[in-house]
Amino acid sequence: MLIPRITQMRTRAVRMQPTRGKRCVPSYPDEDSKLRASGLQVRRGGNCPNTLEVLQQLLREERGAHGSDKVRPYLVTCLPSRSAPATGRVIESFGVGTLVDFSRCIFREENQDPASSYIIRSLATGSRTLVNYNDLAEMTFDEFVAATEGLGGYDTWYHFEGRIPATTLQCIQWLRRSDPKARVSIEVEKPGREGLEELVAEADVVFFSRSWAESKLYMSAEECLRAQSAKARRGSHLFCTWGSQGAACTLPDGATVSCPAMGSGETIRVIDTVGAGDTFIAGILFGFLHHEHSWDNRTKLSFAVQVATCKVQQEGFNDLGFKALAQMDRGGIGA
């Protein structure tokens, strides 16, 4: 391991959503009807950018406490033109003096608009309806190779959203040849997306969503992990989140660890679940990147569940790193 440790967080084909609009309505509207929204929020989205935003907070809190500067996160994704206002808003959304390096992004100079997602949330039922639009061409395998040139040779970690499984598989297989010491994590989230299970066999760490697991008729996080562990790469860690029931992890030795989101008798007020899975991933990556040996696997899992639980109790991601680490300092995480 090099000191300072330089770890590249990289993702292929992340859907950037700097103009993600979240509209709250009294109830879901009927077709061809008019309804006044109760509220409107506009913020940057995208699975991996969300994860990086929370990871950046955790790293900053840790740096402030220990003066450590061993992790350097990168984002590799497709953005509109360098001069497009939307591109500037994406980068600015990470804050002044961001730890995230955007120099490896791919800019589509012919585009001015980012991918966008519009979320309609019903106050009556809590349901969320998403409408996506993306005119940006997806990243190709050759573009990924060019964008990540020269980044190998360190203690590296690549995280993929798993948007285009066939291309993602090419990228991971190329990494195994060109940078065999690199670790790879993959998110298996969207139900019905062909090719995701093939990625499980290639990754060191896999994150399964509850919606994907239920689409495969698994009744619990543990059942999903038991079934998928037979397909996984040897020595891998598999994680599956399950909403209010917390999450579970299958370890390289085959053991399964579970962690509830709340203690017995506890209740929380759920305000905003958008990005909770991305937040959980940030917590796990932080555990591996910054506390691989000082935290055991149960502590890593408990911490990630706690960060995600903090997230669903607020709008957006502000101060999640501070809140989660402060609770850990009070002895509220781990076993």
Enumerate the language-model features and the residues they cover.
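Conserved short C-terminal alpha-helix that flanks the catalytic cleft of nucleotide-sugar-dependent
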Residues: K311-V312
